[in-house]
Swiss-Prot record:
Protein's name according to its UniProt entry: Argininosuccinate lyase
The keyword Lyase is annotated on this UniProt entry: yes
Pathways involved: Amino-acid biosynthesis; L-arginine biosynthesis; L-arginine from L-ornithine and carbamoyl phosphate: step 3/3
Location(s) in or outside the cell: Cytoplasm
Signal peptide stretch: none
Gene this protein is translated from: argH
Catalytic reactions of this protein: 2-(N(omega)-L-arginino)succinate = fumarate + L-arginine
InterPro entries, sorted: Arg_succ_lyase_C, Argininosuccinate_lyase, Fumarase/histidase_N, Fumarate_lyase_CS, Fumarate_lyase_fam, Fumarate_lyase_N, L-Aspartase-like
Organism per entry: Thermus thermophilus (strain ATCC BAA-163 / DSM 7039 / HB27)
UniProt keyword list: Amino-acid biosynthesis, Arginine biosynthesis, Cytoplasm, Lyase
Length: 462
């Protein structure tokens, strides 16, 4: 048992399958940079409080530098029997520098060590995601600006039934708003997780004269965590990040779903770039939007990670339990999934080919301008609910006759209600309806242009 850091208590080694089941090296080795950073800071703190000599500190820091070089060169001797990244680095350090390496773990447990590593890792991962979100938001802004022309109109839908026409630019900016909130959630999560568990030790703190404020400051944390039990036992910070990732992926999934629908022959609004589609092994004509479909599917994967970790922590007593080892694998996978999805959409969206004429015809159909007629009657003084019934009866008649709203004459309108006058006829044109939706946040070109200019400033494109 000498090769195991905790072997002194045990008379025999673990079962081979149990040892493999217990090991986390396959996924927590991703934290090696954070663990090295933490080790360096912890060593300097131990020296500052008199627990390491200058010579021991120098040896440890040189050893950690050597380990970093080995890992980057791919020559580091990872050993699964040492269970995790922490013990692998410590064991190798001791091999390189001797007894000083064994002193590095003074006043520290793997419990506070892994919690610190994970917070450091998430801090960096969030920064990367925020940069990717900014890049995708810029793409959405550019696409909105490119398609601001009122000729780029598509049907807006409720219940997946044609409802009212909207500008394509308005559609792009709708997803911009969602992604802006997604970025805000990640920023909030980063703010809350940016406290240091280091120094909480196993669960009760330590009797050594450590300086937790020193290590917190050197690792870029706002402050040390105030309760040692909370520091090692809590994973709400990971759940909060997963929740933000889940909501972010839901937004990307909704966008992907719409683009999948719009790219079908039945809709025919858009064509997906060849670089982000695949073919069929049997049907030569097929062009499948696989990347969009996978983004849609992988949203479920991230949701599963959130639900899974919630189930892990829901009944855990304080403080640390081995169950918490199950936090990293789903979290790391969810981060990678969201990261890749953001990158793919940022590359895919500029290559979409929008079919303006097909969109226009679809926006004209489905009686999407019926609300304009109801609003007209309401503006003339008729209670809106009554106006709604008048136009509803008119639409029913047109449906029965197989006619469109634009086919109506003034006489037919007045036959349904005498308040209809000559100025109602322009409302049967798509361009008129679009320009009328000029309320703040509406789809009128001037309203969309106003929001677009604000969005450009928000993402640094002004």
């Amino acid at each position: 048992m000498a090769h195991r850091t905790w072997g002194g208590r045990f008379g025999e080694g673990p079962d081979a399958l149990a040892a493999r089941f217990n090991a986390s090296l396959a996924f927590d080795r991703a934290l090696w940079r954070e663990d090295l950073w933490q080790n360096r800071v912890h060593a300097r703190m131990l020296h500052a409080v008199g627990l390491l000599s200058a010579e021991e500190l120098e040896a440890i820091l040189k050893g950690l530098d050597r380990i970093e070089e080995e890992i980057e060169a791919g020559t580091f001797p990872w050993r699964e029997e040492l269970e995790d990244v922490h013990m692998n680095l410590e064991a190798r350090l001791t091999e390189l520098v001797g007894p000083p390496g064994g002193k590095l773990h003074t006043a520290r447990s793997r419990n506070d060590q892994v919690a610190t590593d994970l917070r450091l890792y998430l801090r960096g991962a969030i920064d990367e995601l925020l940069a990717l979100l900014l890049a995708l938001r810029r793409v959405l802004v550019r696409e909105a600006e490119k398609h601001l022309d009122p000729l780029y109109v598509l049907p807006g839908y409720t219940h997946l039934q044609r409802a009212q026409p909207v500008l394509l630019a308005h559609w792009f900016l709708a997803y911009y708003e969602m992604l802006k909130r997604d970025a805000g959630r990640l920023e909030d999560a980063k703010e809350r997780l940016n406290e240091s568990p280091l120094g909480a030790a196993a669960l009760a703190g330590t009797g050594f004269p450590i300086d937790r404020h020193f290590t917190a400051r050197e690792l870029g944390f706002k402050a040390p965590m105030r309760n040692s039990l909370d520091a090692v036992a809590s994973r709400d910070f990971a759940l909060e990040v997963l929740s933000a990732l889940n909501i972010g992926m839901l937004h990307l999934s909704r966008m992907a779903e719409e683009l999948i629908l719009y790219s079908t022959e039945e809709f025919g609004f858009v064509e997906v770039p060849d670089a982000f589609a695949t073919g069929s092994s049997i049907m030569p004509q097929k062009k499948n939007p696989d990347i969009l479909e996978l983004i849609r599917a992988k949203a479920g994967r991230v949701l599963g990670a959130l639900v899974g970790l919630s189930a892990v922590v829901k009944g855990l007593p304080l403080a640390y339990n081995k169950d918490l080892q199950e936090d990293k694998e789903p979290l790391l996978d969810a981060l990678a999934t969201y990261r890749d999805s953001l990158r793919l959409l940022a590359a895919l969206l500029p290559g979409l080919k929008w079919r303006r004429e097909r969109m226009w015809r679809a926006a004209e159909g489905g009686y999407t301008l019926a609300t304009e007629l109801a609003d007209y009657l309401a503006e003339k003084g008729l209670p809106f609910r009554e106006a709604h019934h008048v136009v509803g009866r008119l639409v029913r008649r047109l449906v029965e006759e197989g006619r469109a709203l634009k086919d109506l004459t003034l006489e037919e309108l007045q036959a349904h209600h005498p308040l209809f006058a000559e100025d109602a006829l322009p409302l049967l044109r798509l361009e008129t309806a679009i320009h009328r939706r000029r309320s703040y946040g509406g789809t009128a070109p001037e309203a969309v242009r106003e929001r677009l200019e604000e969005a450009k400033k928000e993402v640094g494109l002004d």
